[in-house]
UniProtKB/Swiss-Prot annotation:
Name the record gives this protein: Fructose-bisphosphate aldolase class 1
Primary localisation category: cytoplasm
Lyase in keyword set: yes
GO MF term list: fructose-bisphosphate aldolase activity
Enzyme class, spelled out: lyase
Subcellular location: Cytoplasm
GO annotation, biological process: glycolytic process
Quaternary structure (record): Homooctamer.
Alphabetical list of InterPro entries matching this protein: Aldolase_TIM (IPR013785), DeoC/FbaB/LacD_aldolase (IPR002915), DeoC/FbaB_aldolase (IPR050456), FBA_class_1 (IPR053414), FbaB-like (IPR041720)
NCBIfam families registered for this protein in UniProt: Fbpase1_Arch, PRK07226.1
Family stated for the protein in its record: Belongs to the DeoC/FbaB aldolase family.
The entry's keywords: Cytoplasm, Glycolysis, Lyase, Schiff base
Any Pfam family matching the protein: DeoC
Length: 281
């Protein structure tokens, strides 16, 4: 008989993944990590209730936020939508050397009390502070798994050594390494960078050894079709979907983009056709 905690992990992962094994998750940690200026393109979205209400109505599979925001607006995440609470973060107000460290904001028990279906944490693989984040992640995984909760790793390789050796953090060899490290450190889901091509992202997926890999949405793409094409390539490469923030909340009306992403991720639709169907072009 399977251990009860493993059953719990599998059941809770299904709160995010549809039967096709894919997910579209809305990221809402930008106000802390980047600052409220991220919301200036559409200022009403600085109010978490406003934007969460919109994305839930549009059919999002899951929402990711920090513990404090979950206390403020977590009740806007309807029961049919997965809630992911991220326990580590940083601000852009830190001195540059400390930008490569994520600090812990809360504990697994806090996230569970707030109704989390999954726990998330970031590791900057290759950072001079990598050891601190590895230890944080190990403690979160150990405790959460004992209670039957899945853990998501935002596997973000970055640091001076990576810049020096590989030139950029999105080099597929670096992203692939980060995905493998995430899998081997106990992640049940991985969020990471786009590597620039379907072929290289497929290697990232393979390196993750069966752990679902989701795209980190990144900065807003002015042409929505360009972003939909990237997501389509992620799916073609074997990726399990996307975690998207700015490409949703920096749009006046985020609903068409969400619905177009759902078409690409869950229905395998051509990006241009999906964009046309939702009035994006």
């Amino acid at each position: 008989m399977e251990a009860p905690q493993n059953v719990g992990i599998k059941r809770r992962l299904k709160r995010f993944f549809r039967r096709d094994g894919r997910a579209l998750i809305f990221a809402m940690d930008h106000g802390f990590e980047h600052g409220p200026t991220d919301f200036e393109p559409v200022w009403e979205h600085v109010n978490p209730r406003v934007i969460i209400r919109k994305v839930v109505r549009a059919g999002i599979d899951g929402v990711m936020m920090l513990p404090g925001l979950a206390r403020i607006a977590g009740d806007e995440v309807k029961p049919e939508v997965g809630l992911m609470i991220k326990l580590t973060s940083k601000t852009n107000l830190r001195p540059k050397p400390e930008q490569l460290l994520q600090s812990q904001l809360g504990f697994v028990d806090d996230a569970i009390k707030l109704g989390a279906d999954a726990i998330a944490a970031t590791v900057y693989w290759g950072s001079p502070q990598e050891d601190v984040m590895m230890r944080q992640f190990a403690e979160i995984v150990s405790y959460a798994h004992d209670l039957g909760y899945p853990v998501v790793q935002f596997a973000y390789p970055r640091g001076p050594y990576i810049d020096e050796k590989y030139g950029k953090k999105e080099d597929y060899r670096v992203v692939m390494y980060g995905a493998r490290a995430a899998a081997e450190s106990g992640a049940d889901m991985i969020k990471t960078y786009w590597t620039g091509s379907k072929e290289t992202f497929a290697k990232v997926v393979e390196a993750a050894a069966g752990v679902p890999v989701l795209l980190s949405g990144g900065a807003k793409t002015e042409n929505p079709v360009d972003f939909l094409k990237v997501v389509w390539e992620v799916i073609e490469a074997g990726g399990a979907g996307a975690v998207v923030g700015r490409n949703i909340f920096q749009r006046e009306n985020p609903e068409p983009m969400i619905k177009a992403l759902i078409r690409v991720i869950h229905r395998n639709e051509d990006p241009e056709e999906a964009a046309k169907a939702e009035g994006l072009i």
